From Swiss-Prot:
One of its GO terms (molecular function) is acetylglutamate kinase activity. One of its GO terms (biological process) is L-arginine biosynthetic process. It comes from Vibrio campbellii (strain ATCC BAA-1116). Its main location: cytoplasm. This is Acetylglutamate kinase. The lineage of its organism: Bacteria, Pseudomonadati, Pseudomonadota, Gammaproteobacteria, Vibrionales. Belongs to the acetylglutamate kinase family. ArgB subfamily. Catalyzes the ATP-dependent phosphorylation of N-acetyl-L-glutamate.
Length: 263
């Protein structure tokens, strides 16, 4: 493998991909094939809300959300951390290993990768992550492994915290000085004629929201992506995992979705 001078790439994996073995296999297979010829360092950050929802239903625990964020009572965090840092992380790691990758399962707390503190007392054990020390993560990458990082973190006092996976990915990318792609069910932002918009600024997005081109759940995704770009201080990309043949282009630094520009 040849080392490139490209910045590392953090891929936040979300949406239905997490529950679809075939999709995961296509993604990990594409990473394995890409890394045989080029060594751009890649790390995965994941959530796993669907697993948590299933577990909460089985345990007859109520799921409450505030402004789209899951309320995590402190007494429930062991269960939620088990689902995310345990089951979801090992399912992804297992699939990556099956597809020929040397995968390492990590959390935001490992090696002090991210600092995490309580976001809002009303949300309970929900944390906000900020970039920390990437030394351990860099060592894993330098060893040729694929880090798969759950969005569970620890505070300075050792309290487990559930961090929104998009926000966790921003913090990891910040720690690594990496580029960030939010990979999901959505291919990017479409204009009024159904064509993909290649780049989007906050002003352009506001105009499209006013004109009702961007509507409903997409408004939340767009605002989150713009916030991520501002937090990171560099463009971030929203793209889909639905076209595996395009993933190699993405790993190489080409845009296949919509790039969100920081202010």
């Amino acid at each position: 493998m040849t080392q490139t001078n490209q910045a590392p790439l953090v891929i936040k994996l979300g949406g239905a991909a997490l529950s679809c073995t075939q999709t995961l296999s296509q993604l990990f297979g594409a990473i394995a094939a890409y890394q045989k010829s080029a060594q751009r360092q890649i790390a995965i950050v994941h959530g796993g809300g669907y697993l948590v929802d299933e577990l909460m239903t089985k345990l007859q625990l109520e799921t409450v959300k505030k402004n789209g964020l899951r309320v995590t009572p402190y007494e429930q965090i062991p269960v939620i951390a088990g689902a995310l840092a345990g089951t979801a992380n090992k399912l992804l790691q297992g699939q990556a290993i099956a597809d020929g990758l040397n995968a390492v399962g990590l959390s935001l707390a490992d090696g002090g990768l991210c600092h995490v503190e309580e976001l809002d007392p009303e949300l309970g054990a929900v944390g906000k992550a900020s970039p920390g020390d990437s030394t351990l993560l860099q060592a894993v990458l330098n060893a040729g492994a694929l880090p798969i990082i759950s969005s569970i973190g620890l505070t300075e006092k050792g309290q487990m915290m559930n961090v929104n996976a998009d926000q966790a990915a921003v913090a990891v990318a910040g720690a690594l000085d990496a580029e960030l792609v939010l990979l999901s069910d959505v291919s990017g932002v479409l204009d009024g004629k159904g064509h993909l918009i290649k780049t989007l600024s906050e002003q352009e997005a506001d105009a499209l929201i006013q004109g009702q081109v961007i509507t409903d759940g997409m408004i939340v995704k767009v605002k989150a992506a713009l916030e991520a770009a501002n937090d990171l201080g560099r463009p971030i990309e929203v793209a889909t995992w639905r076209y595996p043949e395009k993933l190699t282009q993405l790993f190489a630094g080409e845009s296949i979705g919509t790039q969100f520009l920081p202010q």
